[in-house]
Curated annotation (Swiss-Prot):
<protein>
    <recommendedName>
        <fullName>Protein crossbronx</fullName>
    </recommendedName>
</protein>
<dbReference type="InterPro" id="IPR000608">
    <property type="entry name" value="UBQ-conjugat_E2_core"/>
</dbReference>
<dbReference type="Pfam" id="PF00179">
    <property type="entry name" value="UQ_con"/>
</dbReference>
<comment type="similarity">
    <text>Belongs to the ubiquitin-conjugating enzyme family. FTS subfamily.</text>
</comment>
<dbReference type="InterPro" id="IPR016135">
    <property type="entry name" value="UBQ-conjugating_enzyme/RWD"/>
</dbReference>
<feature type="domain" description="UBC core">
    <location>
        <begin position="20"/>
        <end position="176"/>
    </location>
</feature>
<dbReference type="InterPro" id="IPR050113">
    <property type="entry name" value="Ub_conjugating_enzyme"/>
</dbReference>
Length: 242
């Protein structure tokens, strides 16, 4: 009987711990939503909240027009343990902070360890935005041998034409697979559909109408508009109201 009671208490404690963790992860997602990060879309997996799916849209600079899929893997005891989340791209991404072998983004230069209550996932995504917006600035003051991709760093500093060409190869390769069959049946996996005028046209027109209305409202009250987004075939640009 004593053993049964002990087992029951352990199960109850585990359940409470799991619920608390799920609540904290949901809070992280809500914070990301409230930040309205431009060009980055993420969502937790339906099956496992410790795994997230994401897509990065480059807007300018070397990575303009890029569409890179990535996953976020959270430590088992996130956010209470000091281990950092992992961001892993699904394809090659030429960048000094991205490992060419594992495709993992190194965030340790901004986050030495995870501080529960102080560090948040939206900050990690902001960091991702910043290093792709200005890769040169992202490596300033960092020794080359401390970077995940020393070759990328050397090209960035000494042969930017070649660096840009390598990045364009990555972008072309990524776009070539944007409509591939999802590698998982998880309903939260981010899927792109080719633009079909008869199906998506009416939706696009409603978006445009809403954008015009929102812009008029924004001019009137100085507020920020939000709304739906879509992607035109061949362009990969979110037609979002921002």
């Amino acid at each position: 009987m004593t053993l049964d009671l002990d087992a029951s208490k352990k199960d109850e404690k585990l359940l409470i711990t799991t619920i608390q963790q799920e609540y904290k992860i949901l809070a992280e997602y809500k914070m990301i939503e409230s930040e309205k990060l431009s060009g980055i879309y993420v969502i937790p997996s339906y099956e496992n909240s410790l795994q997230w799916y994401g897509v990065f849209f480059g807007r300018q600079g070397f990575y303009a027009e890029s569409v890179f899929r990535f996953s976020i893997l959270l430590p088992d005891r996130f956010p209470d343990e000091k281990s950092l989340p992992s961001i892993i791209f699904q394809q090659d991404v030429m960048h000094p902070h991205v490992c060419p072998f594992t495709h993992t983004l190194d965030i340790s230069h901004a986050f030495s360890e995870w501080r529960c209550g102080e560090d948040h996932l939206w900050q990690v995504l902001k960091y991702m935005q910043a290093i792709f917006f200005d890769p040169v600035d992202s490596i300033r003051g960092i020794e080359t041998d401390k970077l995940k991709n020393a070759e990328a760093a050397e090209l960035l500093m000494n042969n930017r034409q070649e660096y840009a060409a390598r990045v364009q190869e990555n972008i072309k390769e990524s776009k070539a697979h944007i409509y591939d069959t999802p590698p998982t049946e998880d309903p939260h996996y981010i899927v792109f559909e080719k633009f079909q005028p008869d199906v998506h046209g009416p939706v696009l027109e409603r978006i445009k109408a809403g954008r015009n209305k929102a812009e008029a409202s924004q001019q009137a009250n100085g507020g920020h508009a939000t709304g739906l987004s879509w992607v035109k075939e061949g362009e990969f640009k979110p037609l979002s109201i921002e």
